[in-house]
A protein has these predicted regions:
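Glycan-recognition and processing domains
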Residues: 1-71, 593
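A short beta-strand element within beta-rich, extracytoplasmic domains
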Residues: 72-96, 594
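Extracellular carbohydrate recognition and processing domains
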Residues: 103-138
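Noncatalytic modules at the cell exterior or secretory-pathway interfaces
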Residues: 132-154
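Active-site-adjacent "subsite" loops/lids of carbohydrate-active enzymes
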Residues: 186-212, 254-285, 289, 294-358, ...
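Catalytic domains of carbohydrate-active enzymes, especially glycoside hydrolases
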Residues: 213-244, 359-363, 463-469, 524-532
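Aromatic- and acidic-residue-enriched carbohydrate-binding clefts of CAZyme catalytic domains
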Residues: 238-279, 307-340, 372-409, 559, ...
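Active-site neighborhood of glycoside hydrolase catalytic domains
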Residues: 344, 348-500, 512, 516
């Protein structure tokens, strides 16, 4: 008889009674707790729900509360969840968060608190967030506040923090059988089908990272999940997110930024540079440490940015130095893009990719999903077409198949050059495995050809190892729910069939319900693809946020669990929510608190 599939999402599959720890005023050191709001301290506040009463901890947007420890005396594996008081006002946005780790561990994970349900303006509830299954032998649990210094001194306004509200810990011990099942699941490689993307900008923008531990937080959520690759952005155009000898740094000499977060981003990079710490290397090392591959990703069209967020264009740049290599549109006007029609542009980009490959990365990824096209009506490609076909492409329909096919030869040549360069770097380093090449592309055959990409040739010649269609929506629309019909992937499945090329469709939009993520994954699997990609996993506004969606998302490589869930009637996957009855001395059972 075939064994029944167990759906191991969160802690719902465990059999033991949970242990609730609601007396958070036991945390140490005691002088980091206060009964009234105080800088650098956690405020204690009593509360009641139907099944529990206790003392929660709160910290505000300027508190910069100290790290505290809840002491434990437990052994073995436990599922750890945390009860939180969620977002209650639009001003808090997605910034409400807590930091959590075991005592003795080096790196926190950031849990982004969810919004409260729509229960009216005076409705208050606690929400449970599943963290992970971990061995608590010899460990307590540590809570921190996510924040950044934004001004000198040690006063109100010196720090900007994510408000935090922690009510309880829930621990469920694993039985011997459950421990064996969990460990067997962790050792399995056939479910590790998921690939994550981090733009290496959002975390600096949001939190002004300044230490290696801050960078490692962006990697830590993928530990013990179905993810096998991290696609970490290394640059775009001539700007790099690593210490480069070829490109520029993210340390623009600018006094007025279009967004406050961009100033935080630059200040973060300046501090890392002054300390000689390369965030790229930290991310690479920690990714490998937790067992994932690391693929350096590059925005091929990132040479020049549109206003009003054009502060990225400040100072000397490849774009400004070489107007002769810019794009040209159908009317003969210069466009604000570097054209890959010119070999000099391609070789500059390849020099950056070579530099990235001199680090112990597993692959590079070319991001063709922003600010296309890279080839238009530049003189070399126009004259070449005239010689071959005897026609001027300016007089043809813009989508004439001969013109589109011929023009796509430019990026095919670029991909050949990239393949040759990566193979050469691999041989020079004595690598046993090829430096892999991934490409994020458009969602249809026509869209890709219009943007100069002949994917059939790329796959047929072995120029790309992983193909990532960005979305099934037109014009790279990130807001469209992608891949609602298996037929939308048919073209890509046929392209890679019988080849070594991996197909990993990107699931969009970024945020969906846990049920919707399972539906989209089921569609991808039914279409014949075995892997999935997730653009923008970074930070609290990304996907690795520990909300309900992350519980489902991090196990989407378990196709059997998705199938079993659908066969059982698709039960709700959301976490428990419990109405607060009392908060401090306020009775919340009144229509308005009183």
């Amino acid at each position: 008889m075939e064994a029944k599939t167990i759906d191991r999402i969160g802690d719902s599959w465990l059999s033991q009674q949970p242990i609730y720890l609601a007396d958070l005023d036991r945390c140490t050191p005691a002088d980091a707790l206060a009964t009234e709001p105080r800088l650098r301290c956690w405020r204690t506040l009593t509360y009641e729900i139907d099944s529990l009463s206790g003392t929660m901890l709160l910290a505000g947007p300027e508190t910069a509360a100290a790290t505290i420890t809840y002491p434990l005396n437990l052994r073995g594996l436990h599922a750890v969840s945390v009860g939180v008081l969620p977002i209650t006002s639009s001003e808090e946005g997605h910034q409400l968060a807590i930091l959590l780790k075991r005592s003795g561990d080096e790196t926190f994970t950031a849990l982004t608190l969810p919004p409260q349900s729509d229960g009216g303006p005076h409705h208050h509830e606690l929400v449970e967030m599943f963290w992970r299954i971990t061995d608590l032998t010899g460990h307590g649990l540590q809570i921190g506040q996510n924040g950044a210094r934004v001004a000198p001194g040690d006063n109100a306004g010196s720090f900007e923090c994510a408000p935090a509200r922690v009510a309880y810990f829930k621990l469920i011990p694993l039985t011997d059988a459950e421990t064996r099942a969990f460990q067997s699941d962790q050792q399995s490689s056939d479910t590790r089908r998921l690939f994550a993307h981090n733009d290496a900008h959002g975390p600096h923008y949001q939190y002004r990272l300044t230490t290696p531990e801050h960078v490692r937080r962006e990697i830590e959520p993928y530990r013990d999940t179905d993810f096998s690759r991290m696609y970490w952005e290394a640059g775009g155009g001539d700007q790099t997110s690593y210490f480069s000898r070829v490109g520029g740094r993210n340390t623009f000499d600018l006094g007025d930024f279009g967004r406050r977060g961009d100033r935080m981003h630059v200040e973060s990079w300046r501090e890392f540079e002054q300390r000689g710490i390369d965030p790229f290397d930290i991310a690479l090392e920690h990714t490998h440490e937790i067992g994932l591959q690391f693929h350096a990703s590059y925005r091929v069209a990132g040479f020049h940015y549109p206003p009003p967020l054009d502060h990225f264009n400040t100072g000397s740049s490849f774009y400004k130095r070489h107007p002769e290599w810019r794009g040209v549109d159908r009317t003969g006007r210069q466009t604000p893009r570097m054209a890959y029609t010119f070999p000099e542009v391609r070789q500059f980009v390849i020099s950056l990719l070579r530099e990235m490959a001199q680090r112990p990365i597993d692959g590079i990824c070319l991001l063709y999903n922003r600010r296309m096209p890279l080839v238009e009506y530049e003189s070399p490609v126009v004259e070449g077409f005239k010689r071959e076909f005897g026609d001027d492409p300016h007089g043809l329909n813009a989508h004439d198949p001969r013109w589109l096919s011929y023009r796509a030869g430019v990026l095919t040549e670029f991909m050949r050059e990239v393949r040759a360069a990566m193979d050469q770097e691999g041989r020079a380093q004595g690598r046993n495995q090829r430096i892999e090449i991934s490409a994020i592309v458009g969602g249809t055959e026509r869209e890709n050809l219009i943007n100069g990409m002949d994917l059939a040739t790329w796959v047929g010649e072995g120029l790309v190892d992983t193909l990532i269609p960005y979305t099934s929506g037109p014009n790279y629309d990130s807001g469209v729910t992608a891949w609602t019909d298996p037929k939308q992937l048919e073209h890509f499945v046929n392209l890679v069939r019988g080849t070594s090329c991996v197909l990993a469709p990107n699931l969009m939009p970024r945020h969906m319900t846990p049920e919707e993520f399972r539906h989209r994954a089921a569609t991808v699997y039914s279409a014949g693809a075995d892997h999935m990609f997730f653009w923008d996993c970074a930070g609290g506004s990304g996907r690795a946020n520990y909300r309900d969606m992350w519980n489902a998302l991090r196990r989407l490589g378990h196709r059997d669990e998705i199938d079993a869930w659908r066969a059982s009637g698709e039960p709700n996957l959301s976490a428990s929510r419990m109405d607060l009855r009392k908060l401090g001395d306020w009775d919340l059972s009144y229509v308005t608190p009183g």
